Amino acid sequence: MAIILVRAASPGLSAADSISHQGTLQCSTLLKTKRPAARRWMPCSLLGLHPWEAGRPSPAVYSSLAVNPAGEAVVSSEQKVYDVVLKQAALLKRQLRTPVLDARPQDMDMPRNGLKEAYDRCGEICEEYAKTFYLGTMLMTEERRRAIWAIYVWCRRTDELVDGPNANYITPTALDRWEKRLEDLFTGRPYDMLDAALSDTISRFPIDIQPFRDMIEGMRSDLRKTRYNNFDELYMYCYYVAGTVGLMSVPVMGIATESKATTESVYSAALALGIANQLTNILRDVGEDARRGRIYLPQDELAQAGLSDEDIFKGVVTNRWRNFMKRQIKRARMFFEEAERGVTELSQASRWPVWASLLLYRQILDEIEANDYNNFTKRAYVGKGKKLLALPVAYGKSLLLPCSLRNGQT
């Protein structure tokens, strides 16, 4: 499921330190410190239904069909991403039939104590920047816990390329080099100790490179794009930068042996959590992004609400803005609802951190409402007290049977 990836600069944690604008690789600062069988599962927006609720039309808050300038129907972003989900699910099922979890990349030669140090450093970074999620990972088996740390760190380093302190120096060429480095670590040739942790993880779990490549593509998008014409475009961006994390994580989290859900439905729910988290980031950071000249809101929906870019830059909360935000929050919550069912299908030891992520991120939407939809000058956040209260709730939910069993699915 999706790891929390906050789209904001974090001082002292920059992957750009390892890819300079001249293109030379340098040492990273991080090193120093079920449904009935007859029904095919598809994303709720493609079915035109409220998440997990048959027979009831949803509000038009998802896009499922795009139209080109000639007026011809084209494949929507959701369908493109769903095709990726199907491929990832098929790959997982195929690789689990022929497990290679004890294999190591042929070219990788690193002492065992070196790998331990690499994983420990990943854990330190996760603890520093995602404390609640880190706490939840401590309930996982050691192998899964370390693997999730390694994935988290790679995602964070990638995110820092365009959001970190050196973001102004990052070019498309630098991202191409980062992708080449990704390909190297997937073939057992890591550049540094943090890469080595992920390379070892890849050798132990059936993880595919495609979601990692797609995340880098999202960073490329951030370099060239500051507006999104409609939700179809925004959905693809959210998939690239956050939905991919869910697809990376499912093979590590594992699916409960007693689950009756299809593999593709679990992947799709993981994707939904990533999308929900990113939409929440966007709604929380409207003012901050506007000050950087960026608007991550569907332009057509702004226009329909009688709003423009100028209204965003002025940052005045009006009734039009409140009504617009209510609709955006409703859509984000629908993705959270879609994600909830998939969390229950994960291996029990993996559920707590995912539930914690889901519950805490969803509360950010509540805080935006509590701030009277002022996300221009107020940054919604969940206080420490509410975080502490959410942890036992998340733990309790992690003990429940998979929804596919409770609902009698086969």
UniProtKB/Swiss-Prot annotation:
EC number: 2.5.1.32
Main enzyme class: transferase
Gene3D superfamilies according to UniProt: Farnesyl Diphosphate Synthase
Extent of the transit peptide: 1-62
Protein name, UniProt field: Phytoene synthase 1, chloroplastic
Reactions it catalyzes: 2 (2E,6E,10E)-geranylgeranyl diphosphate = 15-cis-phytoene + 2 diphosphate
Family, as annotated: Belongs to the phytoene/squalene synthase family.
Keywords for this protein: Carotenoid biosynthesis, Chloroplast, Isoprene biosynthesis, Plastid, Transferase, Transit peptide
Tissues expressed in: Expressed in embryos, endosperm and seedling leaves. Expressed in leaves and endosperm.
Pathway terms, separated by semicolons: Carotenoid biosynthesis; phytoene biosynthesis; all-trans-phytoene from geranylgeranyl diphosphate: step 1/1
Function: Catalyzes the conversion of geranylgeranyl diphosphate to phytoene. Mediates the first committed step in carotenoid biosynthesis.
GO BP field: carotenoid biosynthetic process
Quaternary structure and partners: Monomer.
PANTHER family with a match to the protein in the record: BIFUNCTIONAL LYCOPENE CYCLASE/PHYTOENE SYNTHASE
A Pfam family it matches: SQS_PSY
